[in-house]
Amino acid sequence: MATPVVSASGPPATPAPAPVAAPASASASVPAPTPAPAAAAVPAAAPAASSDPAAAAATTAAPGQTPASAQAPAQTPAPALPGPALPGPFPGGRVVRLHPVILASIVDSYERRNEGAARVIGTLLGTVDKHSVEVTNCFSVPHNESEDEVAVDMEFAKNMYELHKKVSPNELILGWYATGHDITEHSVLIHEYYSREAPNPIHLTVDTSLQNGRMSIKAYVSTLMGVPGRTMGVMFTPLTVKYAYYDTERIGVDLIMKTCFSPNRVIGLSSDLQQVGGASARIQDALSTVLQYAEDVLSGKVSADNTVGRFLMSLVNQVPKIVPDDFETMLNSNINDLLMVTYLANLTQSQIALNEKLVNL
């Protein structure tokens, strides 16, 4: 499999340089890279027409063209074809919603990285609607970086995306992620490639080095900047990152959080009865908090909040009104059914064990 190579330095591909910027919080222009024969870099823009006579005279005729055609104004670059995700302005009020599986997958890829690799990169997948951009899946992409160039296995990325579409056809390419706390010049080159896969791609950075004592997670979207008719740059503007989860993901996150209090960072799986007991304890704690808040409001210690009051009223109205005697009857009936199922399961297990012994005689 051929690995496309993107050079991070060298002369510009066209007479007019097309610099891009790679700041983490500010913009700075760098010369556009010159792609290798199998390069995957975004082609540099065609030279813009200049009103300077000296600049026009310095333009040489291409092979097969007359001097008149060589001095004609350069054509405007064709607009990029729209991708499947993030159409138009960034939706959702510039908010990106991340699921816990994304962070777990990124950290796992970083722990399994090749020897000598400073960071890992990958593709972000998810869904887009009018109100939010939700990142629900991702996969890592092999790459190599040096001071002068970056090589990304883009064929691998395309094949992985095709496989993901067979399982989750609704997931689209939203952008890419990288481990680290800043944005480098190589990040700009990789971002240009993903700009061809999806308009307004998201760049997610995860600080796995824990420089500030915590895993900083930031999201950016690129914005063109510069003087019209001159060299253009790219500025990465931050986005708001929020966390979303499904019920099954929340259970896993709660279990992982328990390892924070374990000396060896290992915790065993609890039984069904223990899970029911833990859930009941959490509900009791929540009810105690709500009751204390209501008492503080009635006593004047805390000012009333209309939003909280409406939410509590809606919650109370959702509780079905059942006579205590009827509720006890229903509970006892369910318990009897559960005990009967348990008894039959144990009886079946005993019969199977007895049958195996009779067969082996």
UniProtKB/Swiss-Prot annotation:
Modification N6-acetyllysine occurs at:
K242
Q: Name one GO molecular function term.
A: metallopeptidase activity
Q: Which CDD domains match?
A: MPN_eIF3f
PTM summary from the entry reads: Phosphorylation is enhanced upon serum stimulation. Phosphorylated during apoptosis by caspase-processed CDK11.
Residues with PTM N-acetylalanine: A2
Q: PROSITE patterns of this UniProt entry?
A: MPN
Point to the regions of Low complexity compositional bias: 1-11, 21-42, 55-78
Membrane-spanning residues: none
The answer to whether keyword Nucleotidyltransferase applies is: no
Region (Disordered): which ranges? Answer: 1-42, 55-86
Catalytic reactions on record: Thiol-dependent hydrolysis of ester, thioester, amide, peptide and isopeptide bonds formed by the C-terminal Gly of ubiquitin (a 76-residue protein attached to proteins as an intracellular targeting signal)
Keyword Phosphoprotein listed? The answer is yes
Q: Which residues carry this modification: Phosphoserine?
A: S50, S262
Q: Which residues form the MPN domain?
A: 96-226
SMART domains tied to this protein:
JAB_MPN
Where does it reside? Cytoplasm
Enzyme Commission number(s) of this protein? 3.4.19.12
Q: List the disulfide bonds.
A: none
Which major enzyme category is it? hydrolase
Q: What does this protein do?
A: Component of the eukaryotic translation initiation factor 3 (eIF-3) complex, which is required for several steps in the initiation of protein synthesis. The eIF-3 complex associates with the 40S ribosome and facilitates the recruitment of eIF-1, eIF-1A, eIF-2:GTP:methionyl-tRNAi and eIF-5 to form the 43S pre-initiation complex (43S PIC). The eIF-3 complex stimulates mRNA recruitment to the 43S PIC and scanning of the mRNA for AUG recognition.
Question: What is written about domains in the entry's comments?
Answer: The MPN domain mediates deubiquitinating activity.
Family assignment from sequence similarity: Belongs to the eIF-3 subunit F family.
Per UniProt, subunit arrangement is:
Component of the eukaryotic translation initiation factor 3 (eIF-3) complex, which is composed of 13 subunits: EIF3A, EIF3B, EIF3C, EIF3D, EIF3E, EIF3F, EIF3G, EIF3H, EIF3I, EIF3J, EIF3K, EIF3L and EIF3M. The eIF-3 complex appears to include 3 stable modules: module A is composed of EIF3A, EIF3B, EIF3G and EIF3I; module B is composed of EIF3F, EIF3H, and EIF3M; and module C is composed of EIF3C, EIF3D, EIF3E, EIF3K and EIF3L. EIF3C of module C binds EIF3B of module A and EIF3H of module B, thereby linking the three modules. EIF3J is a labile subunit that binds to the eIF-3 complex via EIF3B.
The protein in question is named Eukaryotic translation initiation factor 3 subunit F
Q: Which organism is it from?
A: Macaca fascicularis (Crab-eating macaque)
Q: Which gene encodes it?
A: EIF3F
